[in-house]
Amino acid sequence: PISIKDNTNLLIGRQTNNKAMDYQLLLRNIEIIRSINPTIQIKINTVVNKHNYSESLSEFISQVKPTKWKIFKVLPIMNDALSINDQQFHYFLENHHQFENIISAENNEEMTHSYLMVDPSGRFFQNIEQQTGYQYSEPILSVGIEKAFQQIPFELVKFLHRYR
């Protein structure tokens, strides 16, 4: 998740030692990166949730000038604490319509079972639709990639849809 407001960043966990993410430092770091590599492509990911759906990130996006802006509707994993409804998600998207040429938005249905994720233990994992956490494969190095891949739900059509 990303926010420009300190209190929102604290609520959504964008913090270090109880101090909110430094927005100005982030902008300076992006400037440094671009001075080193002027052709680098910057992608911003935003997870829209109950604390940031009404925020405007327009000034931030205008300053960063990313190549791509991925906007995700928060996926409830363990509970609904940060959940929003479709109307709130669309509200955020409508408020940022001027960036539609770089926005790629994904709702919960589009995200579920469409990512290949590997945890620090070397296991594939996927979200479980009933908000009970994750489903894990056995470790890839123990059973092989093919067997581990068969142990999790994955929808290739959804995966490919993001790259068309």
Residue ranges and their predicted role:
Residues 7-125, 129-163:
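Radical SAM enzyme [4Fe-4S]-AdoMet core and its adjacent flexible, acidic
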Residues 2-6:
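A glycine-centered beta->alpha junction motif in the catalytic cores
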